[in-house]
Swiss-Prot record:
Protein name: Uncharacterized protein BB_0539
Regions crossing the membrane: 17-37, 54-74, 84-104, 107-127, 138-158, 161-181, 203-223
Membrane topology of this protein: Multi-pass membrane protein
Pfam families: Bax1-I
Record flagged with keyword Transmembrane helix: yes
Main location: membrane
Alphabetical list of InterPro entries matching this protein: Bax_inhibitor_1-related
Source organism, top-level taxon: Bacteria
Cellular component, GO annotation: plasma membrane
Keyword field: Cell membrane, Membrane, Transmembrane, Transmembrane helix
Amino acid sequence: MIDLTQEKQEILIKNKFLAKVFGLMSIGLLISAVFAYATSENQTIKAIIFSNSMSFMAMILIQFGLVYAISGALNKISSNTATALFLLYSALTGVTLSSIFMIYTQGSIVFTFGITAGTFLGMSVYGYTTTTDLTKMGSYLIMGLWGIIIASLVNMFFRSSGLNFLISILGVVIFTGLTAYDVQNISKMDKMLQDDTEIKNRMAVVASLKLYLDFINLFLYLLRFLGQRRND
């Protein structure tokens, strides 16, 4: 009876941690969606960002800096600061993602977002419930991720449609798998953390960022297949 009660308590603690992670991730996605749409409707902001390559690159560099601050320098900042940086990152990502409204129809963007949400939810449930250890699969997926990053950089020069198609397929597969892998790791994270609320809150922000990036990248790769271009 004592063991059963302890097990239930551990499950409740784990679920509370996961709820915090998914809640913060969802807020980040909502902020990104709002900023993406608002930016796409503001001609002045679009002109400032997308007509000047320096402005756009500056935003990208700031985003990389925020990711480092949230994850790499986590021990140097408070959980509240980390949360604020994550929300700022979500807003900036929304601004840079506003370009998709110039390329694809609004209907196809909404449709792809729905497909992404369904896929993400399914893989999250799988990652949480499966008894299979996904560590080995995760290692291959991370290697594959580096592979498509390198291939994407190479294709910036060669502009091969065949390679671009292959990268898109691999991107969908990799981020679908990474969603399950990350959720499984996050579901185990609470056991490894000390009974320190501040540390748990910091790690919840990092976990939210991981899942946020999985979702955004899966969405962008699916959009390559499901998005209807405005000039079609």
